[in-house]
Amino acid sequence: MKTEQLIPLCRRYHAMLLHSDEQTISIAVFNTPPAELMEALRFATQKRIDIECWSQEQMDKRLQAQEKQAQLAQNDGPENIAERVNQILEQALRQRASDIHIEPTETHLRIRLRVDGVLHALPLLAPELAAPVIARLKVLASLDIAEHRLPQDGQFALNLAGRPLSFRIATLPCRYGEKIVLRLLHQVDQALDLEALGLSSSQLAAFRQALNQPQGLLLVTGPTGSGKTVTLYSALQARNREQVNICSVEDPLEIPIAGMNQTQINPRAGLTFHSVLRALLRQDPDIVMVGEIRDAETAEIALKAAQTGHLVLSTLHTNSTSETLTRLQQMGIARWMISSALSLVIAQRLVRKLCPHCRRNAGSAADLPHSLWPRPLPRWQAAGCEHCYHGYYGRLALFEVLPVTPGLRQGIVQGLNAIEIESLARAAGMMTLFESGCQAIEQGLTSLEEVVRVLGIPHGD
């Protein structure tokens, strides 16, 4: 018997259907459930029956909510709900949102958009819209619309404003219903070009030199949403030729690239990063890309591949280039292996760009400790205008590029800590992330407040 047929059966005996899956059904009752109801449910479903005892007030509130949803469905049918969802997605697209948060509360449905790394709220919607909007999104992603107690993940694609778009969806049970976060998957409007990333000339030269080597490990590090994927794909595109066999293992496959052999992991089927990586190494690759190093086994396979004639590119979640080296050691990788295989580490962050239409110099300057930045930094203000609304428009990447030189290899083998490694690298000319941010402030591209928001202020001497 289908879920929609169980609902009236339960109501006939003053019970309420809460949940139904392949093994169990859950019902709420005010008193002891009637024997007739239990017998009918067992006969109709052949499933285990879980019973919750609710107060009459709880039963009445849930019933009223269901009646409101039913009335809403009559007045705002599937076509209108679908159109309403499309309007939300189109508005997110117009505002260049990377994520959409759909959050039911007791009194309204809240929708927030993450634009340039910061959440902005849209006008509140009626709470009765929560259930049909969430159901519509779950249908698009082929999720179980009857499952409200467990998180679910999925993907879907649709055409909006004449463009094919892909979304990743994640649900989470909360106090007043299911919260949904939609991630707009990478739409590559810009060319995947190393020149367009925003690296300085010396950083770009070091990147190209490592990328053109026949073997070695290149790591791009930073938190989620820091632009690592675009940097990684731009590097791969720079080497994407008929004479080069490029294989990747990803989760998910975010940017399809012609000429590359891309594999998406599937843990449920046993297709993990390390199992795919082992298989890729039997595919005669010249270049291997691992979407993310998540565990010691994947790290060890990647490092061994980089030692045996393969160029390997991957990402790692660390705060700086020097911390990357100690993080690999904490994962159990031997120092000699890191020293011999690693060729370059890039740390990066994204900061919001000041709107060029309303940006102005405040006329004052900020003095930082000399060890952080030797010159006064201009203070910029941007109040917001019809072009940006918030004072910022778009984002730019800040980079810290660490080539693994012979001196640094020796320091790794000796077991230098992150602070000692950074001192060694800065003495050799490396620009830190904070220094990269200060340079962008001097150029009027971003503000000190934005750099501090993203990076904090390092400890000065």
What are these regions (language model features)?
Residues 43, 50-90, 95:
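Charged, low-hydrophobicity low-complexity segments
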